Swiss-Prot record:
UniProt protein name: Interference hedgehog
Pfam families, per database record: fn3 (PF00041), Ig_2 (PF13895), Ig_3 (PF13927)
Domain Ig-like C2-type: 37-142, 154-235, 251-339, 345-432
Protein's job: Mediates response to the active Hedgehog (Hh) protein signal in embryos, functioning upstream or at the level of patched (ptc).
Residues of the Fibronectin type-III domain: 462-570, 578-673
Source organism per UniProt: Drosophila ananassae (Fruit fly)
Length: 880
């Protein structure tokens, strides 16, 4: 069955229309994970071999539709290098729609049609422009299909006679050269043989020959690209005779058969090792290898008659193989076969760097494997590094930029190249420009300049050029920094942007948002960093951004422009790893610490950093933003928060071209304000405070120090209070002593009561203390009554303790107690049941008035401040 399938394939190949044949290099192993900025070559052009006059198509596909495609070309040289020796130099851009080449673009695919001529043979590259980034593919070779016979090879005709049962190996195709590798057809007596007789490289292999195998053998090579056929100059006459038991012969080689061999294989392919030789009786082959352990007895090898087949060839299969042909007759025949396994180049350590500052020295590393050893070269935004005066390639392939300049910003690629092809890896290099220190253009008036003559004028230090990251199809995130400086303070920032590459130059557009500078503190060694988002953009367009800083002198200064940024649609972007928020630690009253992780299968090298968003959980306003540089970060401290406040946080990872989805929201809180240890516990009535302090409360002082300070404060408070009390008592005594020198009857009567009011029957009445609100309109009558009572001084009095008002009693007095007090006052004053006397006088005493009983003199204490203005009129208190 395999022989039938092989025959059908050969027939289809030979009868199909002839054209360009791709060079069948083995597929390289899967690419290792390396930092991809989101734009790359998905399918580079393939090398082709075609005859003159044919039209071939080179096809290139990128991960995203670029702004435009360009193709570059270099003439083919025998060793595949340019004149100056660099494999990455000497390429020139092709003019589109020319007679030699025609370029078409369809979304993310570009096709180059080339007419095969002597001046179009060479190497081609596909270049895709993504804003300021130029991504270059690996090279594709366009070679001419050729078939020829080695001119120095003589015509050979072999005569072989062997016994039946042997196996014969005839190297017919050695004199023929073909590009691409020729397909072989073998003939016996002019009749074509089946493909089951074919070996590798034009070798005819006849197994277990018989008398019927005798005949004249020849071969013919066919170029699969051009269809050209050429007959080999070698022929062989084979005569097979029956074996005789009496004739024995040790294994030997026939004339023209190779002895020692060197075989080259490509990693991943299939290798067939042949062991020629005949004998009588027919010998048996035994395989071994002094260099490779288990070279024969494994799942990838199969022992055939006079051959060893190795599938899925690996680099470890390189070495020496020995074939012993033994038929029992000494000596056995030994074959030494040297196997070399070639490997396409593969970059195992790609270049990677996050961000560099202008003027810094940077070394980019690139390591690759391959056999033969690959040669390393570098492209800086599509241009060979040998043309850059600041670039130097070290012998180990690493690239050194002695002083990074703004022109180095873009796409940096490392290429590894050997005879089997090329492999590349790239990264987006971001350069932070140096801050431009410019003096303020505003000038003071003449007098002010005289007063400040000799002083250095204040400077306006502009922010750095912003770095741009895609957030969505319509928004981006900007990151910039203000370097440490002693210049004018910044009040706020404005973001400006404009589209580029659309014909007429567009004006700058300014966003409405004022981005506050915040606290005048530097949050890093470099200065202070800021972030802001810009929305309402349009995808598939290229933008430039800049930051406008407004200073305290009401002047402004803009930053340098950002690099061109092409806003790509998110549907074509690979998703970024989404961080998972683990926990939020309470760091202090104004700071928390975020902890997160990535999934185990997440590619960390795709990440440039993280964005942290936060806001108070009670707020529905905009999120505050913080930038976390570095893909390996797993925690971050966020400060300048409110004490004892619950915040909600979310994260997203970002790269130069895109950002991930948001992580799940998670809440955390800052520590509560510190509580002093001198604060006394608050006790509720009948309840003892047993509250345990929260773990958020922080005591900044030790208990001994705090207790000492608290005790001292209490002692000082006690001494001050005692002094104030003594001072007030002394003033009170002095006031009373001074008042004795100026006695007044009204004041004396306020402090005395008549003797008849001290009778036992009156004791109960005197014990009451009643507060009555008087009519303010009766104050004039009260004054007249007081003057009358002052004249009646012939009664006997005794002194008693004064009764003072208690202001809260006004709140507790009910209407019922007021009525009882009025009735008591009527009985005491013998007012004939008329309590209207209350509205006439509040201070009473016995008076010598004929026809009237003795009057009761009552004390009217002075009003306290709290009893004033409780109603629309003046309020007085009367004590009975």
């Amino acid at each position: 069955m395999p022989s039938i399938v092989s025959s059908l394939l050969l027939v289809v190949l030979l009868t199909s229309p002839l054209g360009a044949i791709p060079v069948l290099y083995p597929s390289p192993p899967p690419l290792p994970a390396y930092p991809s900025p989101g734009v790359r070559i998905l399918r580079p052009p393939e090398s082709l071999v075609a005859p003159l006059g044919d039209e071939v198509v080179l096809e290139c596909e990128t991960s995203l539709p670029p702004e435009r495609f360009e193709w570059s070309y270099r003439r083919w040289t025998p060793n595949g290098t340019a004149v100056n020796g660099s494999p990455g130099a000497g390429f020139k851009y092709l003019k589109t729609s020319s007679m030699k080449a025609n370029v078409t673009q369809e979304a993310a695919i570009s096709r180059l049609k080339v007419l095969v001529r002597q001046d179009t043979l060479g190497e081609y590259r596909c270049n895709g422009w993504f804003g300021p980034l130029l991504v270059t593919s690996t090279t594709a070779r366009l070679e001419l299909a050729t078939t020829s016979v080695k001119s120095q090879e003589p015509v050979t005709s072999l005569q072989w006679q062997i016994t039946n049962g042997n196996s014969v190996l005839w190297p017919c195709g050695q004199p023929v050269r073909s590009n691409p590798a020729a397909s072989w057809t073998f003939y016996r007596n002019g009749v074509e043989l089946g493909p089951e007789y074919s070996g590798t490289g034009g070798n005819l292999f006849l197994r277990n020959v018989s008398v019927d195998s005798s005949g004249s053998y020849s071969c013919q090579a066919t170029n699969p690209a051009s269809g050209e056929r050429i007959k080999s100059t070698s022929s062989m006459e084979l005569q097979v005779v029956p074996s005789r038991g009496s004739q024995v012969k040790a294994p030997y080689l026939l004339p023209g058969q190779p002895g020692s061999q060197t075989v080259t294989a490509i990693e991943g392919g299939t290798l067939l090792l042949l062991c020629p030789g005949v004998g009588s009786p027919p010998p048996t082959a035994v395989w071994s290898s002094p260099d490779i352990v288990g070279a024969v007895n494994n799942k990838r090898t199969r022992v055939l008659a006079h051959a060893l087949e190795i599938s899925n060839v690996q680099i470890g299969d390189s070495g020496t193989y020995i074939c012993y042909l033994d038929n029992g007759v000494r000596p056995p025949l030994e074959h030494f076969i040297q196997v070399k396994v070639e490997q396409p180049p593969q970059i195992v350590r790609p270049p990677w760097i996050d961000m560099v500052n202008e003027g810094e020295r940077v070394q980019l590393e690139c390591e690759a494997t391959g056999v033969p050893t690959p040669e390393i070269y570098w492209l800086l935004n599509g241009k060979s590094s040998i043309y850059d005066t600041e670039a130097e390639q070290l012998p180990n392939g690493h690239l050194v930029l002695h002083s990074v300049l703004k022109r180095h910003a873009g796409y940096v690629q490392c290429f590894a190249r050997n005879s089997l092809g090329e492999h590349s890896a790239g990264m987006s290099l971001q350069v932070t420009p140096k801050p431009i220190h410019s003096e303020s253009t505003q000038q003071s008036d003449h007098n002010h300049s005289k007063a400040n003559r000799g002083r250095r004028p204040a400077q306006m230090i502009p922010p750095s050029a912003p770095n741009v990251t895609r957030l969505s199809d319509e928004s981006v995130m900007l990151r910039w920094m203000v370097p440490r400086n002693d210049g004018l303070a910044i009040l706020f920032f404005k973001v400006q942007y404009r589209t580029v590459g659309e014909g007429k130059r567009k004006n700058w557009q300014t966003t409405n948002e004022n981005i506050p500078y915040g606290r005048p503190e530097w949050n890093s060694e470099m200065g202070k960093s800021f972030t802001a988002s810009v929305t309402d953009l349009k995808p598939q367009r290229t933008y430039r951004f800049r930051i406008m800083a407004v200073y305290t002198n009401n002047d402004n200064k803009e930053s340098n422009m950002s690099a061109k940024f092409f806003l790509q649609p998110g549907a074509a972007l690979d998703p970024m790893p989404v961080p998972e928020m683990l926990e939020i630690d309470e760091y202090s009253e104004t700071a928390v610490v975020l902890h997160w992780r990535l999934d185990s299968d997440a590619d960390e090298q795709l990440i440039t950093g993280y964005y942290a968003y936060y806001r108070p959980s009670s707020s529905a306003g905009e999120y505050f933003k913080a930038t976390i540089e570095g893909a390996s970060s797993r925690s971050f401290t966020i400060g300048n928060l409110e004490a004892g406040t619950v915040y909600e946080f979310k994260l997203q990872s970002f790269s130069a071209e895109s950002a991930s989805e948001f992580s799940a929201l998670k809440q955390g809180r800052t520590q509560r304000p510190m509580v002093s240890t001198t604060e006394e516990a608050t006790l509720q009535t009948g309840v003892r405070d047993t509250t345990t302090p929260s773990h958020n409360e922080t005591f900044s002082m030790s208990p001994i120090v705090t207790g000492t300070i608290g005790g001292g404060a209490v002692l000082i408070l006690f001494v001050v209070t005692t002094c104030l009390c003594m001072w007030r008592r002394r003033n009170s005594r002095a006031h009373r002593g001074g008042g004795q020198n100026k006695p007044r009857m009204a004041e004396l009567r306020e402090d005395f009561v008549p003797l008849d009011s001290c009778s036992p029957t009156k004791q109960r009445q005197r014990s009451r203390h009643i507060h009555i609100t008087l009519n303010p309109l009766a104050q004039q009558q009260q004054q007249a009554l007081d003057e009358k009572n002052d004249a009646e001084h012939d009664m006997t009095y005794f002194q008693r303790q004064p009764t003072y008002d208690y202001d809260p009693g006004l709140r507790r007095m009910s209407s019922s107690s007021l009525r009882r007090s009025q009735r008591t006052l009527e009985r005491a004053g013998s007012s004939n049941g008329n309590n209207n006397n209350l509205n006439q006088s509040a201070d009473m005493g016995p008076v010598d008035n004929p026809g009237k009983p003795g009057r009761v003199l009552m004390k009217r204490p002075r009003l306290s401040s709290r009893s004033e203005n409780l109603s629309s009129g003046s309020l007085n208190s009367v004590g009975v």
